[in-house]
Amino acid sequence: MKLGVDPTAPDIHLGHTVAIEKLRQFQELGHQAVLLIGDFTATIGDPSGRSVTRPPLSREQVLENAETYTKQAFKILDRDKTEIVYNGDWFRKMTYEEVLKLNSRVTMQQMLAREDFKARVEGGKEVRLHEMQYPIMQGWDSVEIRADVELGGTDQLFNILVGRDLQKEEGMLPQIAMTMPLLEGLDGVRKMSKSYGNYVGVDEAPEMMFGKMMSASDELMDRYYLVLLGEKRDMGLHPMEAKKLLAWKITARYHDSAAADTARSDWETRFSKRDLAAADLPEVEIASLPADMNALALVSFLFENVFQVKKSNGVLRKEHFTPGAIQLNDVKMTDPSAVLELAPGSVLRLSKKHAVRFK
């Protein structure tokens, strides 16, 4: 059972766990689990689902990321039953002649049939030749480890099918492709990603994890229950209680039940002591906000235009951001330069007496 990961970032978020949890299930059924670390392919960058070329990473960055990535993966996987391999072990030994022979097995037409490449070409954007190597390299990984099954997100299907073709040419039985759904981020719009700021990291503090889960929209609950927990939401519970239970279960899974209990208690204490009743919050249309504002500019804009209070940037930094008075869905925002991910229903607290809800 192969699951390949490129450690382009040091942390795992809940979106990554969907495939990792599936690999764990196969471990429990007695199958050999192989976690393939793309220490070579990560320096190229997977173009799947990308509208632009990924920035390159150094090998040193990749290896540093791989160390924390695997450590966090073992919160889910059974360490003793997991084989870890690095694709740099074979790609760094290849001669240029061997690379050309490998490339000769795939046509340009096959590569340009990819939806993301096709969209870029039609949109007049660049597709670099090294990006076209990526599906071939991922496919060759399956040849090297003689994979029977490859797990991945739905965006990996093209790459996995290339692996099947290469295995056939090598006289192997082609691997089975098992794709997992891509998990929507907390904004409910784009897939969960650290670069979008809509993620929940598996190594985050329990309080932060619980608070982030509580910031998810009600519409995401059924999806999160099913994809992350493999169960259906109890429709007999009030939506708020169902969301608390979801947040508790996720926090307990990556920490423990005691930490989840404390995180829930802390969140409920803060929630119950809010100075403003939720129903009384002024509403602000997201579409009415100036584009590309960072947190500092947004808070300044809201103070002045919603509450008719003008504050200097220095005061906002010192009296609001630094002490953690700025909270998005009860999660403290201390970085004035951050770009906040706003969704309908999100509540931004500016101070004890000032808060808005977005629509």
Predicted regions and their residues:
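Divalent-metal (Mg2+/Mn2+/Ca2+)-assisted nucleotide/phosphate chemistry catalytic cores
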Residues: 55-179, 186-188
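Flexible loop/turn segments at secondary-structure boundaries
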Residues: 9-10, 42-44, 92-94, 184-187, ...
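Active-site catalytic microenvironments for nucleophilic, acid-base chemistry
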Residues: 22-25, 29, 139, 165-170, ...
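N-terminal catalytic cores of NTP/NDP-binding nucleotidyl/phosphoryl-transfer enzymes
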Residues: 1-47, 151-157, 163
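Well-ordered mid-protein domain cores that form the structural environment of catalytic cofactors
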Residues: 24-71, 76-77
